[in-house]
Amino acid sequence: MASLIGAGTAARLDRVIPEQELAERPLSELFRDYVESAPERRYEVWFFNVTPPEMELALPTTDAKLNYLAHTANLASAVRYDCAGDTDGGRCVHARLLERRRERFAKILNKFLDLHQILGTIQQ
């Protein structure tokens, strides 16, 4: 529990909460037991790098990544609906690759946005 941390020190929650609890318990319970139960405790904020290396190399800034996501969504839409009424399995390999990359990148951005929302709730 939060009592594992001495007063005045800051630790990462992933090092305080046992791995089994992280896997089994819902976020709301973990928040209640480790954060709300001891509001005077301070925890470090950390980020895991979940960006694929090729994406990080080509698009080093958040703005570049967001622009890439918007561009690939537009391109995928154009490729999909450019065919004469064929909107399903008749797409070429390039269109399928673009779709997979766009989905992968969207998942990464959603993780960042989820983290931002969680941190915003903790600060309130």
Curated annotation (Swiss-Prot):
Listed InterPro entries: Herpes_TT2
UniProt keyword list: Host nucleus, Viral genome packaging, Viral release from host cell
Taxonomically, the superkingdom here is Viruses
Q: Could you mention a single GO BP entry for this protein?
A: viral DNA genome packaging
Q: Does the keyword Secreted apply?
A: no
What is a single cellular component term in the Gene Ontology annotation? Answer: host cell nucleus
Q: Where in the cell is it found?
A: Host nucleus
Q: Tell me, what does this protein do in biology?
A: Component of the molecular motor that translocates viral genomic DNA in empty capsid during DNA packaging. Forms a tripartite terminase complex together with TRM1 and TRM3 in the host cytoplasm. Once the complex reaches the host nucleus, it interacts with the capsid portal vertex. This portal forms a ring in which genomic DNA is translocated into the capsid.
Subunit note: Associates with TRM1 and TRM3 to form the tripartite terminase complex.
Similarity-based family: Belongs to the herpesviridae TRM2 protein family.
Recorded protein name is Tripartite terminase subunit 2
